[in-house]
Amino acid sequence: MILHTYIILSLLTIFPKAIGLSLQMPMALEASYASLVEKATLAVGQEIDAIQKGIQQGWLEVETRFPTIVSQLSYSTGPKFAIKKKDATFWDFYVESQELPNYRLRVKRNNPEVLKVDFTKQYSGYLDVEADDKHFFYWFFESRNDPQNDPIILWLNGGPGCSSLTGLFFELGSSRINENLKPIFNPYSWNGNASIIYLDQPVNVGFSYSSSSVSNTVVAGEDVYAFLQLFFQHFPEYQTNDFHIAGESYAGHYIPVFADEILSQKNRNFNLTSVLIGNGLTDPLTQYRYYEPMACGEGGAPSVLPADECENMLVTQDKCLSLIQACYDSQSAFTCAPAAIYCNNAQMGPYQRTGKNVYDIRKECDGGSLCYKDLEFIDTYLNQKFVQDALGAEVDTYESCNFEINRNFLFAGDWMKPYHEHVSSLLNKGLPVLIYAGDKDFICNWLGNRAWTDVLPWVDADGFEKAEVQDWLVNGRKAGEFKNYSNFTYLRVYDAGHMAPYDQPENSHEMVNRWISGDFSFH
């Protein structure tokens, strides 16, 4: 969500009030640093005189438009959860490599009969970066079909700050968790024809932990590459299988960077075959033009806002886009952070204040901070001691989303950066890319995703722009529409929200099976 939650969670978290933005200073300093930009510079230890006047103006614009944000900022972090390090004998395997001397992979063979999430072979464990005290949790499920030959998928949720176990238990994984905290078999799990790795990243997400933090996508990419290299070293039987990276929401940032990092590594021991991004945030400068149309009746659903609110969104849009453009030009935290704060409040805020579900424009929130009460069942399930013991979890409290990470990424300027440039790079290198979007999502809506794919510069951009939109059929029924040229495909999924596998499990299952079978055109 975009917190994204998964990515979505991340999206929710971008609103200062929703994420509890806290950049509060010591009380002795509060009086002398009254403005938002002064607070921000103090928080990161930079002198205000060193900040360009134009950038300062961006912060002042935020403060003028949204005055309450100053009182909501605090420079503080929450308590770190207790860590329960497992004895060395708990782990079945340790994996190390001379090429990656700072990394180690711990592997535990899981007994499927204990948790009954699936009957397939499973492993869980941690990637350790001891020098930086970083520990990434993962859970691997073999394919239900032909694990020796089926593809491997790495699944990433977004936020930033949301656990990929949300994808496992809420969307595309082996089981759903019901109100009685029992796993319910999912016949449309994506591991029907692929083995899947669920990775909690960056650190301090889900069961991952660290005494430090990661606040930008590029740094996270280096750790993900190391994880994959050690994983495939331990499981050489998968090295020649197709390997895909898939995710949603803020993974629209993660995946392009991670895939580009992987392709830059000449000694990789696995076969990156494609990437899939669902309802992603990838090109903010284009996508932020489409919050007003989606909220105001132009996205295939009735308007949820009165005319004056829609007009106000248009009035503030020009300033929003100018701030994002400044971020694209400089890519500095002090330019990009005010763009995120201003635009998220001006373009997402009016919809969010209605109380409707930002992940599905058809629905009201039905409970919980992420609008889905079922997500609370997952948190409760994963906080049970017998579950944590079975997985080897070393964190005593599991949370679907970590709002501090969301805040850290926002204030590091990561939110508004032009990560679509990495998609151009991937396409130019010949890697197949699928961008899919449920058409009832608001926060990373299909209008914005369609728009940025249409204007993306790459070697075959002209051909993609001119390609015809065609019906996507599942079992003879219209399930969406797609556009394809060469190795680039955009797919609109009908009647699905931010999390397409949740709303349209059968159609999403067909989508991924067709894609990983090598049908990159959907013809």
Swiss-Prot record:
Residues 1-20 form the signal peptide. GO terms for biological process: proteolysis. Disulfide bonds join C162-C401, C296-C310, C320-C343, C327-C336, C365-C371. Its EC number is 3.4.16.5. The active site is at S249, D441, H498. Keywords: Carboxypeptidase, Disulfide bond, Glycoprotein, Hydrolase, Protease, Signal, Vacuole, Zymogen. Pfam families: Carbpep_Y_N, Peptidase_S10. One of its GO terms (molecular function) is serine-type carboxypeptidase activity. Glycans are attached at N193, N271, N484, N487. It catalyses: Release of a C-terminal amino acid with broad specificity. It is found in: Vacuole. Residues 21-107 form a propeptide. InterPro entries: AB_hydrolase_fold, Peptidase_S10, Propeptide_carboxypepY, Ser_caboxypep_his_AS, Ser_caboxypep_ser_AS. PROSITE patterns: CARBOXYPEPT_SER_HIS (PS00560), CARBOXYPEPT_SER_SER (PS00131). GO terms for cellular component: fungal-type vacuole. Involved in degradation of small peptides. Belongs to the peptidase S10 family. This is Carboxypeptidase Y.
